[in-house]
């Protein structure tokens, strides 16, 4: 087996089992412990897994503050947002999720006559100067870490909306665990708006792939359009097999 293929399969195996011993990996992949150690170290260095006593475990993505995330990969996020905005048409009713990439869409939507429903404080503030944008807040209490509005009855505020398109953010994406999020209260509204939309767009830069957070709010095959800056070939194959339109944002 090729080294790159084996490392990918080790990662998937750890993701599936949450934590495994090095001896288990040696047995499953039929290679030496030294080989497993080298393969595991590569995955640790990339941040996908972490070492624990006697083995390895999934490196769950922690909930970072909005400001921490906003400064990362800013150029790529703007390209992705600009590409996503091209799919919005006058008259659309859309949902814009709380996220640093989805937030960037507002600049490219400001001249369109649309209705935006959002759980994001920053989307509301950024849209404020643009009269063409009708903005509806989902309400709830302000979760300062994500600068979004949340409540455990949050889904009730959007369960009767009929969205033309929803533009979703994610903490981590993987084929095995789907589209994930670190906030349980945010995840409920994400699940609901996806069910209420004609088309689901997922906006994510390359750093979000092969990671997952605490809550899966939808499976990857439920996404209609995946917009990113670059993606591994395994996701390209998955998109083709599941009729997901994969769009690479370019200048």
Predicted stretch roles:
Residues 62, 101, 123:
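A generic "binding-loop/recognition-motif" signal
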Residues 99-100, 206:
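Active-site metal-binding loops of divalent metal-dependent hydrolases
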Residues 2-9, 15-23, 28, 34-98, ...:
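HTH-adjacent hinge/linker in prokaryotic transcriptional regulators
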Residues 2, 11-12, 19, 125-251:
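Conserved phosphate- and dinucleotide-binding cores of soluble alpha/beta proteins
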